[in-house]
Amino acid sequence: MTDSDGKTDKSGEPAAEVEPVVSKPYVMPDDPEDDALDALNKQLAEAKDRTLRTLAEMENLRKRTAREVSDARTYGISGFARDVLEIADNLQRALDAVPADARAAPDPGLKALIEGVELTERSLHNALEKHGVKKFDPAGEKFDPNVHQAMYEVPDPSIPVGTVAQVIQAGYMIGERVLRPALVGVAKGGAKAAAPE
């Protein structure tokens, strides 16, 4: 059972013609308004700026943290070293308290004691230097308030003004920092010190 077109349905009756489905044409929405595009560009620029600032801040934080860790390694023992300096000073005072004629005496017990104190002092200074603590003796140097502490003035015309004439107590540095300033007497007489070149 076919019709003249050759189309039949199961019941043998001619099939109804089916109209082909045609999709509706796609209509483009109106172009975004210029204001909306400007707003998106502004948001993009702000996001880029925030990202760059965050990256820069993170890099600065990394550098600052590395510097703080380095400083902690170098200067972390400052408090302990300051306390140990008192021991070094006491050892030096003990050696200074022994009169020269007693050092020359043939007493083996006294000589052994003096040698023991000297050895202990050297060992202590070596241990301090191993950890970055260095002793400095500024005798004859130009007075520098950053590393010297003036205790008094020395009226000596043979020494240029502003020169360290006497050292009462040696100073100590840890790395590039002053751990303890040197206690000094500064010359107030004589010619002015020559300017360093």
From Swiss-Prot:
InterPro entries: GrpE (IPR000740), GrpE_coiled_coil (IPR013805), GrpE_head (IPR009012). CDD domains: GrpE. It is found in: Cytoplasm. Residues 1-12 have a biased composition (Basic and acidic residues). One of its GO terms (cellular component) is cytoplasm. PROSITE patterns: GRPE. Belongs to the GrpE family. Participates actively in the response to hyperosmotic and heat shock by preventing the aggregation of stress-denatured proteins, in association with DnaK and GrpE. It is the nucleotide exchange factor for DnaK and may function as a thermosensor. Unfolded proteins bind initially to DnaJ; upon interaction with the DnaJ-bound protein, DnaK hydrolyzes its bound ATP, resulting in the formation of a stable complex. GrpE releases ADP from DnaK; ATP binding to DnaK triggers the release of the substrate protein, thus completing the reaction cycle. Homodimer. This is Protein GrpE. It comes from Nitrobacter winogradskyi (strain ATCC 25391 / DSM 10237 / CIP 104748 / NCIMB 11846 / Nb-255). The gene is grpE.
